[in-house]
């Protein structure tokens, strides 16, 4: 992945961190995006993204932090701007940002539903929208990966909001893969079983 530039949302911990460290080890320059909040999406901070950047740089890689929320259009655009300002281009986007607000459907609030859909599905849409536009200007294709879940494919008790969002990502990927073919943009989804 030498000379490739990757943006990874939700890269301050867990699977996103693993993606960031792996891509950096393989030679990519990485934008580590993370709002730095709790698992339920509350709060924010810079230490999570900064910690992953420090790990990458200490291992000899290239990385910069971005602390924006994927749910905000201006912040999603800023992720692409951060990549281009730091590394001159974009090549790879991994939509990994996510939160959990698990509750059985009969007890779920509208706010719990909306928050999860907003981060997982709208967040992936906004990040992809700006990344896609940058790829079209570059004219060299690119790669997009969506982090889904088996909860979106086979279900999991107490995760109607999360399952719906993750199933939505799989559908989003399928259509983007069709539309991206003529531009050399490959789109895939990962559905890990946790």
Label for each model-derived stretch:
Residues 1-31:
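Canonical Rossmann dinucleotide-binding motif of NAD(H)/NADP(H)-dependent dehydrogenases/reductases
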Residues 133, 178-179:
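Alpha-helical segment proximal to the catalytic Tyr-Lys
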């Amino acid at each position: 992945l030498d000379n490739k530039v990757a943006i990874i949302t939700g890269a301050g911990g867990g699977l996103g961190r693993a993606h960031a460290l792996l891509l950096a080890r393989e030679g990519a320059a990485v934008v580590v995006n993370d709002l730095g909040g709790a698992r339920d999406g509350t709060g924010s901070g810079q230490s999570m993204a900064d910690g992953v950047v420090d790990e990458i740089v200490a291992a000899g890689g290239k990385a910069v932090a971005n602390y924006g929320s994927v749910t905000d259009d201006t912040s999603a655009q800023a992720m692409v701007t951060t990549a281009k300002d730091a590394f001159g281009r974009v090549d790879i986007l991994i939509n990994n940002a996510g939160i959990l607000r698990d509750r059985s459907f009969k007890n779920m609030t509208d706010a719990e539903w909306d928050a999860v859909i907003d981060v997982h599905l709208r967040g992936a849409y906004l990040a992809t929208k700006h990344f896609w536009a940058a790829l079209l200007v570059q004219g060299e294709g690119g790669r997009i990966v969506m982090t889904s879940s088996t909860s979106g494919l086979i279900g999991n008790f107490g995760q109607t909001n999360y399952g719906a969002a993750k199933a939505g990502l799989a559908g989003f990927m399928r259509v983007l893969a069709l539309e991206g073919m003529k531009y050399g943009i490959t789109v895939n989804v990962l559905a890990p079983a946790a």
